[in-house]
UniProtKB/Swiss-Prot annotation:
Pathway assigned to this chain's UniProt record: Cofactor biosynthesis; thiamine diphosphate biosynthesis
GN (gene name): thiC
Residues that bind substrate: N216, M245, Y274, H310, S330, R331, G332, D371, G372, L373, R374, E410, Y437
Designated name of the protein: Phosphomethylpyrimidine synthase
Catalytic activity of the protein: 5-amino-1-(5-phospho-beta-D-ribosyl)imidazole + S-adenosyl-L-methionine = 4-amino-2-methyl-5-(phosphooxymethyl)pyrimidine + CO + 5'-deoxyadenosine + formate + L-methionine + 3 H(+)
Length: 610
């Protein structure tokens, strides 16, 4: 049930999903940990236990939690952060008019009511999860993640059936806190967890873990408001978004972001270049390192968990895009390309990259190294410009790692299916197995309005090949700013892609939900089918369009086939008949031959052509 609390500002969706209960699992190394999951109850006639699933929705789906958007979420990680003894509080920078696009009066979004003093690393310290992992420290965040990734399972007494092709990924039967630490230490996974975003519930991005998805939100200069964007965030995580990127490009960027972060249980990412551009009135040529640096600190103090930095767009690569069908389609990439050409010099993002690392390590802001030269059409896929930038991102990854900064790499884009695996293989090779984070890719260019589907195909494939996080695409891609409905469609599409990838990789727990739903389907437990689905509301609605009565919820057919042509009902009849007449013996008789009608010996005697 989606409950809207009208007294809150802004209004957000709360309430449990159907047949679902919020449960928590305690820690062992850190007994005070309470790791949230969702338990889906099944009908008593099933004789099956509840199905436990990963839950990124935060307190919004917990009926026991009182939501107060004006106060923000509980500061879950605050005590963990301070207990490490390597951070200090300070006054922070003053909010300036340009931070909100010079909005004033009624056009200015109200400040978030609660002001928190920002934290930063003490002098000479790195407060990143990578630094802790390299030092051999298993943090509370790491144990929290291990429990989450196991979907509530205890260490298996016997190995689960593994069925899949992992393409070199090493997904263990059971994730331990030490495994999490080692993957982070090796740079194969990141934990986006800014010390100024203690409200976030720890999660991990890496190819040896569950495939994650990101949802983009954000206002534009044309439309949307703070209330709409906060609700989009809550709505996105309700349906399974693991992270959210605020890509606001209009006014009030600072204040809108504060409302989002304070109420977000998932990591928040941004593209700082967008806000920096607003500060210079949208004139790319007027951007400076000083404006950009100030923006990084502003956002780090607020609690942004990962920055998209387009530092791989170099002056020498821009001519490589001239003969493309669609040129440079990345907003950040085009902004930096314009700046480089105007000043005829190397990007300040590239030249000041080590200083950017110093800022990120002081707050534990992870890098999402942007693919500013990604292909915007399948004609441009895997071209010289795209792969030249990827090589540079590999070089920048090593610099960031040397500074104890966490890194993931952004990828395309528009890529036909036969060229997708080359992207994954090359990224693993040149970026040292840093996590890959891709936008789709879209596998064809002919379907505006359906690009959630064209990209979902590519997302499932590249997720199987090893991409750690998939950035959703909505039906509005290339057409307009997504609304609440588009956000849900994009998230569900990408949850399908991510889950399909987990199944194909042979993740040990991935099939539990599939098998439970398949059994419910075969046994005509309609309510269980609805409740186990990624979108129970839509599944129930589609069923009830033609069979709306409660009696139909126990019927052994649906409107597609009716009672006489239902294959599963016929299968039940066949089983019953088999038990009655002892056809098991007949099946055994022909099992070796594999032909129900003619024994192998008779087949061998039959002349060809008869």
């Amino acid at each position: 049930m989606n409950i809207v609390a009208p007294q809150l500002t802004p209004v957000v969706t709360t309430g449990s999903l159907p047949a679902s209960t919020k449960i928590v699992k305690p820690g062992t190394l850190y007994p005070d940990l309470r790791v949230p999951m969702r338990e889906i109850s099944l009908h008593p006639t099933s004789g099956e236990p509840p199905v436990t699933v990963y839950d990124s929705s935060g307190p919004y789906t917990d009926p026991a939690h009182v939501i107060s958007i004006d106060a923000g979420l509980p500061r879950l990680r605050e005590s963990w952060i301070k207990a490490r003894g390597d951070v200090e509080s300070y006054d922070g920078r003053i909010v300036k008019p340009e931070d909100n696009g010079f909005a004033t009066g009624e056009r200015l979004t109200p400040e978030f009511p609660v002001r928190n003093t920002p934290l930063k690393a003490k002098a000479g310290r790195a407060v990143t999860q990578l630094a802790y992992a390299r030092a051999g420290i298993v943090t509370p965040e790491m144990e929290f993640i291990a429990i989450r990734e196991n979907l509530g399972r205890q260490a298996a007494k016997e190995a689960l059936a593994r069925d899949g092709e992992s393409f070199g990924a090493h997904v263990p039967d059971f994730v331990t806190p030490e495994f999490v630490r080692r993957e982070v230490a090796e740079g194969r996974a990141i934990i986006p967890a800014n010390i100024n975003h203690p409200e976030s519930e720890p999660m991990i991005i890496g190819r040896n873990f569950l495939v994650k998805i990101n949802a983009n939100i954000g206002n534009s200069a044309v439309t949307s408001s703070m209330a709409e964007e906060v609700e989009k965030m809550v709505w996105a995580i309700r349906w399974g978004a693991d992270t959210v990127m605020d890509l606001s490009t209009g006014r009030n960027i600072h204040n809108i972001r504060e409302w989002i972060i304070r109420n977000s249980p998932v990591p928040i990412g941004t593209v700082p270049l967008y806000q920096a551009l607003e500060k210079v009135n949208g004139i790319a040529e007027d951007l400076t390192w000083e404006v950009y640096r100030d923006t990084l600190i502003e956002q780090a103090e607020q609690g942004v968990d990962y920055f998209t930095i387009h530092a791989g767009v170099r002056l020498a690569y821009i001519p490589l895009t001239v003969n493309r069908v669609t040129g440079i389609v990345s907003r950040g990439g085009s902004i930096m390309a314009k700046w480089c050409l105007h000043h005829h010099k190397e990007s300040f993002l590239y030249e000041h990259f080590e200083e950017i690392c110093d800022i990120c390590r002081a707050y534990d802001v992870s890098f999402s190294l942007g693919d500013g030269l990604r292909p915007g059409s399948i004609a441009d896929a895997n071209d010289a410009a795209q792969f030249a930038e990827l090589e540079t991102l590999g070089e920048l990854t090593k610099i960031a790692w040397a500074k104890d900064c966490q890194v993931m790499i952004e990828g395309p884009g528009h890529v036909p299916m036969h060229k997708i695996k080359e992207n994954m293989d090359k990224q693993l090779e040149v970026c040292g197995e840093a996590p890959f984070y891709t936008l789709g890719p879209l596998t064809t260019d002919i379907a505006p309005g359906y690009d959630h589907i064209t990209s979902g195909i590519g997302a499932a494939m590249i997720g199987w090949f090893g991409t750690a996080m998939l950035c959703y695409v909505t039906p509005k891609e290339h057409l307009g700013l997504p609304d609440r409905s588009d956000v849900k469609t994009g998230v569900i599409t990408y949850k399908i892609a991510a889950h399909a990838a987990d199944l194909a990789k042979g993740h040990p727990a991935a099939r539990i939900r599939d098998d439970a739903l398949s059994r419910a389907r075969f046994e005509f437990r309609w309510e269980d089918q609805f409740n186990l689905s990624l979108d129970p509301d839509t599944a129930r609605s589609f069923h009830d369009e033609t069979l709306p009565k409660e009696a139909h919820k126990v019927a052994h057919f649906c409107s597609m086939c009716g009672p006489k042509f239902c294959s599963m009902r016929i299968s039940h009849d066949i089983r019953a008949e088999a038990q009655k007449e002892g056809l098991e013996a007949m099946a055994a008789k022909y099992r070796d031959g594999g032909d129900l009608y003619m024994p192998v010996a008779e087949v061998a005697k039959t002349p060809a052509g008869e």
